[in-house]
């Protein structure tokens, strides 16, 4: 069996209320555990609409048929009214995931992090992490041990800002294998477990079709020579594409692929992991910069 980290990002109110419970049902049916990363503050995701002025983002939205994929309540959330606080209103749903799966911190305000993390001061970065960590800790009633920034918007500043929170690992970047990020002072930050596989919205219309997506992503996972990590979203695979994801889980079992929480990808001795940095870069199918793994010799 090939172990593949299954990361599930839960970004919005609707994804937490509707998509995530459906994913719990699908995973339970196959006896699969995963890692859920939750946004717990205001759902302002609709404010991303201004990015339609950027050609690359507009093309992505058209390729993925965003209106039917996400629904208008997600696409307009936080525009004409203040965004609802997800953790405050949907704590029971988050606790349901934490009962059987690894749960980590995604964001306080997903939109704000994805939009402003690149220019925020260290104080602002730290405050956003603290708000989310405190809220999620109160909900699940145990320490939060892992995190993954919204939209993979991470660099060395973000890695440093997370140090005081003592996460066991972070999944903030795209890359090939777990590594130890080198800090400016010569010390090592918490281990990073990069995402290695494209997401549905990155691949669709560029390298595959909706009908061929499951075969495409399984072939990509089987060809992965690093430590494969695959990300899905509660707003997509838990709602509009839940049937397709159900088929993917069955196909994966038949092809010898075992999905698992990200923590199971860590070796007992993390000191043996390679050393690297989280730097800004670009990946096909995604608008704007993301954190990328750069290994150091």
Curated annotation (Swiss-Prot):
Enzyme class: hydrolase
Every NodB homology domain range: 2-260
GO biological process: 4-amino-4-deoxy-alpha-L-arabinopyranosyl undecaprenyl phosphate biosynthetic process; lipid A biosynthetic process; lipopolysaccharide biosynthetic process; response to antibiotic
Pathway(s) served: Glycolipid biosynthesis; 4-amino-4-deoxy-alpha-L-arabinose undecaprenyl phosphate biosynthesis; 4-amino-4-deoxy-alpha-L-arabinose undecaprenyl phosphate from UDP-4-deoxy-4-formamido-beta-L-arabinose and undecaprenyl phosphate: step 2/2; Bacterial outer membrane biogenesis; lipopolysaccharide biosynthesis
Pfam families (UniProt xref): Polysacc_deac_1
InterPro entries: ArnD, Glyco_hydro/deAcase_b/a-brl, NODB_dom, Polysacc_deacetylase_ArnD
SUPFAM superfamilies from the UniProt entry: Glycoside hydrolase/deacetylase
Catalyzed reaction equations: 4-deoxy-4-formamido-alpha-L-arabinopyranosyl di-trans,octa-cis-undecaprenyl phosphate + H2O = 4-amino-4-deoxy-alpha-L-arabinopyranosyl di-trans,octa-cis-undecaprenyl phosphate + formate
Record GO terms (molecular function): hydrolase activity, acting on carbon-nitrogen (but not peptide) bonds, in linear amides
GO cellular component: membrane
Protein's job: Catalyzes the deformylation of 4-deoxy-4-formamido-L-arabinose-phosphoundecaprenol to 4-amino-4-deoxy-L-arabinose-phosphoundecaprenol. The modified arabinose is attached to lipid A and is required for resistance to polymyxin and cationic antimicrobial peptides.
Protein family per UniProt: Belongs to the polysaccharide deacetylase family. ArnD deformylase subfamily.
Protein name (record): Probable 4-deoxy-4-formamido-L-arabinose-phosphoundecaprenol deformylase ArnD
